[in-house]
């Protein structure tokens, strides 16, 4: 059975944001605006996305 995945794209810069939010972007594997990563749909990943929802867009 295949695991569900989410496509997360960074839409805004991490410059001038809270250090914890910048660290969360790094934890998600995002490096720059427009960068997209595919991540497993787990509660921990969902929590990280919820923390920086205003800087990312999610598909899937």
From Swiss-Prot:
Q: Does the keyword Nuclease apply?
A: no
Question: Gene3D superfamilies from the entry?
Answer: Ribosomal protein L30, ferredoxin-like fold domain
Q: Per its UniProt record, what InterPro entries does this chain match?
A: Ribo_uL30_ferredoxin-like_sf, Ribosomal_uL30_bac-type, Ribosomal_uL30_CS, Ribosomal_uL30_ferredoxin-like
Q: Which GO terms describe its molecular function?
A: structural constituent of ribosome
Q: Does the keyword Cytoplasm apply?
A: no
What keywords are assigned to this protein?
Ribonucleoprotein, Ribosomal protein
Q: Report the record's Gene Ontology biological process terms.
A: translation
**PROSITE patterns xrefs:** RIBOSOMAL_L30
Name a GO CC annotation attached to this entry.
cytosolic large ribosomal subunit
The family database entries (Pfam families) matched by this protein are listed as: Ribosomal_L30
This protein's assembly is summarised as:
Part of the 50S ribosomal subunit.
The Swiss-Prot or TrEMBL record describes its family as follows:
Belongs to the universal ribosomal protein uL30 family.
- In its UniProt entry, what is this protein called? Large ribosomal subunit protein uL30
Organism of origin is Shewanella denitrificans (strain OS217 / ATCC BAA-1090 / DSM 15013)
Give the taxonomic lineage as stored in the record: Bacteria, Pseudomonadati, Pseudomonadota, Gammaproteobacteria, Alteromonadales
Q: Which gene encodes it?
A: rpmD
């Amino acid at each position: 059975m295949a695991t569900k995945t989410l496509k997360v794209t960074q839409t805004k810069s991490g410059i001038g944001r809270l250090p914890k939010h910048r660290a969360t972007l790094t934890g998600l594997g995002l490096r720059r605006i427009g960068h997209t990563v595919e991540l497993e749909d787990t509660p921990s990943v969902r929590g990280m996305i919820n923390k920086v929802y205003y800087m990312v867009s999610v598909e899937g």
